[in-house]
Amino acid sequence: PDELWVVARSGDKLRALKEELPVPVRALPYDLTKQESLCAIAALLAEEQPDVRILVNAGGYGKFERFEAIAEEDTAGMLDLNCRALTLLMRAVLPYCSAGSIIVNIASVAAFQPVPYGAEYAATKAYVLALSRAVGRELRSEKVRVLAVCPYWTKTDFFGRANKEGVITHFDCMYDPAFIARKTFAAMKKKR
């Protein structure tokens, strides 16, 4: 039977999601910025040998502040989660993908433009976009699709953490996560 594997640091959020969803959920309480978490997921994949139909890389780390003021641990966090973890999860899952599988990487509209006070975050999202496009081309002959989703600001807990210093004082608009999910699902259903 189909099973949804969900990775998050928060055990409470994972338990709540497991109770909320009508499908079997395997809660994996891992911190994807940690190498041991990525190794544990790779080992679980090797042990279970699942038929992966969809991978969604939606974890995100951001810090909005002047470039020179961003703490080294925040730089490492953005690179580790937004780039390294996403890349290694894609690589770990690929042996279990087949024709019709899809990898969905959440990038950002920030991937396309300079973002003052969000330079490092935007750079990591440009990486996600470029990687998704290139790997998508590589996997085309196997009929495994890679979709980069590039939403505008979205109403999540992310902004409370990323903009803790309050350097961004005005957001033109904030999209509802359900709207982004519907648009993503519609894009996933397209066969191109």
What would you call each of these model-derived segments?
Residues 108:
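Residue(s) in the substrate-gating loop at a strand-loop-helix junction
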Residues 21-36:
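Rossmann-fold cofactor-recognition segment
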Residues 136-192:
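SDR active-site lid
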Residues 58-63:
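Conserved NAD(P)H cofactor-binding loop of Rossmann-fold oxidoreductase domains
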